[in-house]
């Protein structure tokens, strides 16, 4: 087989700048620590969080488990969608090319929502003395929780940067595809 005809792996990064790849993967990884912490807490594997676990499971425990597991799954899945902006599966569904405006719109709205939720609301609530754990976690267990939740502050800004890079790359690709002044929206 001639080495010049070898195709790159189907899941190889397309021609995206390294800063964009770093932002996309970092956005995804920013979702993992709090998601893992939350699951470990709810199943009782996180020492020092028994009171908070009891608080979370008060009322109907099944709903508490479903909520915590569901929230963690949705969070990590949404974080992984940023990776789609640098991968082929984020630009094509089978033979259909995804219009650039769709992921740009959804990504921008999602990023701004994340920034509002975590960087504005959560930080403001903590600054006003309202702790998300209702004051039930103390000492080193509180330090572990804080370290696991700090990366979530990067999720929105990193995703927004990735969305901007995606828009720029798709606009550049379209400008190369229409060299005679013809235009197509990215």
Task: Specify the residue positions occupied by each region the protein language model found.
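Alpha-helical transmembrane segments and their helix-start/interface "positive-inside/aromatic belt" motifs
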Residues: 14-32, 100-110
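Individual transmembrane alpha-helices with interfacial aromatic-anchor signatures
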Residues: 100-106, 135-155
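Hydrophobic cores of alpha-helical transmembrane segments in multi-pass inner/ER membrane proteins
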Residues: 2, 73-81, 147-163
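Perimembrane loop-to-helix junctions flanking transmembrane segments
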Residues: 48-64, 134-137
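Membrane-helix interface/capping segments
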Residues: 49, 79-97
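Cytosolic juxtamembrane helix at the C-terminal end of the final transmembrane segment
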Residues: 5, 9, 16, 86-94, ...
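C-terminal TM-helix exit segments that contain a strictly Trp-centered aromatic cap at the helix terminus
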Residues: 33-45, 112-128
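Interfacial helix-start motif at the membrane-water boundary
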Residues: 59-76
């Amino acid at each position: 087989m001639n080495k010049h005809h070898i195709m790159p792996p189907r899941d190889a990064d397309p021609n995206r700048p390294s800063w964009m790849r770093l932002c996309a993967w970092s956005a995804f990884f920013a979702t993992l620590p709090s998601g893992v912490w939350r699951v470990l807490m709810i199943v009782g594997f996180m020492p020092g969080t028994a009171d908070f676990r009891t608080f979370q499971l008060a009322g109907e425990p099944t709903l508490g488990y479903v909520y915590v597991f569901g929230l963690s799954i949705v969070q990590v899945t949404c974080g992984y969608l940023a990776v789609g902006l640098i991968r082929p599966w984020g630009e094509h569904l089978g033979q259909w090319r995804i219009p650039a405006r769709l992921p740009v719109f959804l990504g921008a709205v999602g990023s701004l929502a994340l920034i509002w939720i975590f960087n504005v609301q959560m930080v403001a609530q903590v600054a006003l003395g309202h702790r998300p754990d209702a004051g039930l976690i103390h000492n080193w267990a509180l330090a572990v929780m804080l370290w696991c939740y700090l990366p979530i502050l990067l999720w929105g800004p990193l995703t927004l940067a990735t969305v901007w890079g995606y828009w720029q790359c798709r606009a550049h690709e379209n400008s190369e595809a229409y060299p005679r002044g013809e235009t197509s929206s990215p």
